Curated annotation (Swiss-Prot):
Pfam family, one: CCDC138_C
Keyword tRNA processing: no
Protein's name according to its UniProt entry: Coiled-coil domain-containing protein 138
Coiled-coil region list: 198-323
Gene: CCDC138
């Protein structure tokens, strides 16, 4: 951007002021009148140096002020001086002033601070010029020949006069003009310096303007960026608000989840505390039971020692009594004869394959002949067996009666035989005993069966071969054959059933039923129970007379009612008249224990699901007894009531039950 050009005030009056200064104005109207001056009569001279314009353009305002202040003092001398100057010279000077006026209108207005300083310098210079001009004008009356030379830089160029008059004036004018020229030249130099400073200042202003333009463009860019940032800020604030709402919702959700977790933790802690207290109580009870058990063991040892002492005392007293009798010797001999077979030594036959062959025959006979008792028992449900089967059964029973004593004696040889052969041998004994159930009881077999049961329960312990010579008096280690206490499950299961068939001692039977309950907890035990048709064996003990064993018997049957693949075959095996007859007799017993009644009701409830058993329930009037028990049962016994209701519902007697209860009310 170029700096603005401003005309200084009063620029049109510069020429008039110069006229008034040199006496060409209104002070000398009679002598010189330049108002109607014809400019075409004079040659206009141009400035030869570009610095001429700078002299007059440097300080226009300051010069005009100076002239206005001092025109009063120097008007008269200058008028007298210029009266002597030729008119042509004045015309040339006037033309120069007109050119100066035109050039001054094209100059630029300089900064105010530079004007003031330049004005002061110009005033001082003109004061010096006036001091020099005053004495000169008073003494000299000759006109000037020249104003200035053509080669100078002064603003007024002088014109040479005719040679006749120039020689007279050359002694006075050059010295004064040269002084004015020197002063003006000094002013010109100062003005050049000021012009250079002003140009430099203008360049600085241009640089500053360019800098401001750049700053303005940068400001515009910043404004655009700020507007964009404002839009982005609004979007960011919106998204931030959305994220804040999502965060608040998530925090609220997590707070709710944390509260639920805290509640669950509190519940778990309370449950854990309850379990811990229960565990501590059980530990305390266990410690008390252990202490009591230890005391009971000590007491049992003492009782056993006392019993041994009493037995020895009884034997001693018996011997003392027998000494006084006449047949004491005979009794002693009989006792020795009874003890002799026990201490007798046995020799194992050399051919062991005979036992293997016998066991094969025993398996064959047991599986294909003796186990047919199942079909005969199934014919007991109101159907008489055929005659040919009856004759065959009698023959089998007679043969079994003959074989059982021999097989009981052979048990003494079992320790010397391979343990793999024990199972077929015991299986043959079991099925032989089962054949005797169908026929009449033989009184001659009582002692044999008791001995057989004791040997199976206790096992057989025999001594090895013993030589009578003194050098071979050392006996071999004793050999045992365990049946009831065997680790083999099939052999132990068969031995348990044989003990239940033959033994009458309550402690042996209790141990046998405990072992049977443990074996029935496994699937293999349940399979063996069905394979060996053990339901009739259990039913023989399901009677009210044996109250001590009744709970164990019911537990054995209850183990078979657990949900498994053996449940349905077991229920079919119990769906016969013998089982329902036994249950009917048991239910008729007065003051039957509540636990036994609950267990029995569970078995009957499962049997009632089979539709064909409804006839057996009605045949033995079990449904009526169940209705009576339901009517008299305390409602607090919820388990028993549920089983009875379910059984009656399966039999289709629920409505009848409601009618009976309403009639009783």
């Amino acid at each position: 951007m170029e700096p603005r050009v401003v005309k200084p005030p009063g620029q049109d009056l510069v020429v008039e002021r110069l006229k008034s200064r040199y006496g060409l104005g209104g002070s000398c109207p009679d002598e010189y009148d330049f108002s109607n001056f014809d400019q075409s009569k004079c040659k206009r001279r141009t400035l030869t140096s570009p610095g001429d314009l700078d002299i007059y353009s440097g300080d226009k305002v300051g010069s005009s002020l100076k002239y206005s202040d001092e025109s009063k003092h120097c008007r008269t001398p200058l008028c007298s001086l210029f009266k002597r100057v030729n008119v042509n010279c004045l015309d040339d000077e006037l033309d120069s002033f007109h050119d100066l006026k035109k050039r001054e209108t094209e100059e630029e207005l300089i900064e105010n601070d530079y004007r003031v300083s330049t004005s002061k310098i110009t005033k001082q210079s003109f004061k010096d010029i006036e001091k020099v001009a005053l004495p000169t004008n008073t003494t000299s009356s000759r006109p000037r020949t020249e104003c200035c030379s053509d080669a100078g830089d002064s603003p007024l160029k002088l014109v040479s006069y005719p040679k006749s008059r120039a020689s007279d004036k050359r002694s006075l004018l050059p010295r004064q003009i040269s002084q004015i020229y020197d002063e003006l030249f000094q002013i010109h130099l100062k003005l050049q310096c000021e012009t250079a400073a002003q140009q430099k200042f203008a360049e600085e202003l241009q640089k500053r303007e360019r800098f401001l333009l750049e700053r303005e463009q940068l400001l515009f860019r910043h404004e655009d960026a700020l507007s964009k940032i404002k839009g982005v800020e609004e979007e960011v604030l919106t998204r931030f608000q959305i994220m804040k709402e999502q965060h608040d919702a998530e925090v609220e959700h997590l707070t709710e989840v944390l509260k639920e977790k805290n509640k669950e933790t509190k519940r778990l802690r309370s449950s854990f505390d309850a379990l811990k207290e229960l565990n501590d109580t059980l530990k305390k009870q266990l410690n008390e039971a252990s202490e009591e058990n230890r005391k009971m063991d000590i007491q049992a040892k003492r009782v056993q020692a006392r019993l041994d002492n009493l037995q020895r005392k009884y034997e001693f007293m018996t011997i003392q009594r027998l000494k006084g009798s006449s047949h004491a010797v005979h009794e002693m001999k009989s006792l020795k004869q009874e003890k002799a077979p026990v201490s007798k030594t046995y020799k194992v036959p050399l051919n062991g394959q005979v036992y293997e062959l016998l066991t094969v025959f025993m398996d064959w006979i047991s599986d294909h002949h003796l186990s047919k008792v199942k079909h005969e028992e199934s014919g007991m449900d109101g159907k008489k067996p055929q005659l040919k089967f009856a004759s065959q059964r009698n023959d089998i029973q007679e043969k079994c009666v003959k074989l059982l004593p021999l097989m009981t004696e052979q048990l003494q040889w079992m320790p010397f035989v391979n343990t793999k052969l024990h199972e077929p041998f015991v299986k043959f004994i079991y099925w032989s005993l089962r054949q005797l159930d169908a026929g009449a009881q033989h009184s001659t077999m009582t002692s044999t069966l008791r001995r057989l049961g004791e040997d199976i329960f206790k096992g057989v312990v025999t001594k090895g071969i013993q030589d009578s010579s003194p050098q071979h008096s050392v006996e071999n280690k004793p050999k045992t054959a365990a049946f009831f206490k065997s680790s083999n499950l099939p052999l132990r299961f068969l031995s348990t059933l044989i003990v239940l068939k033959t033994v009458t001692q309550a402690d042996y039977l209790a141990q046998a039923f405990n072992s049977l309950c443990l074996d029935l907890k496994t699937e293999e035990g349940k399979t063996l129970f069905l394979e060996y048709q053990a339901v009739p064996v259990i039913l023989s003990h399901l009677r009210i007379s044996s109250k001590g064993l009744l709970s164990n018997v019911i537990d054995s049957l209850l183990q078979m009612t657990v949900e498994s693949k053996s449940l349905q075959p077991f229920l079919e095996a119990c769906s016969n008249s013998s089982f329902f007859r036994t249950c009917s007799v048991l239910l008729r017993a007065p003051k039957l224990d509540l636990q036994i009644l609950e267990k029995l009701s569970t078995i009957l409830q499962k049997l009632s699901k089979i539709k064909s058993n409804k006839k057996l329930f009605e045949l033995f009037t079990i449904h009526l007894m169940l209705q009576e028990i339901q009517r008299t049962t305390n409602p607090e016994h919820a388990f028993l009531c549920i089983n009875l209701n379910s059984t009656l519902f399966n039999l289709g007697l629920t409505k009848c039950n409601s009618l009976v209860s309403s009639a009783s009310h």
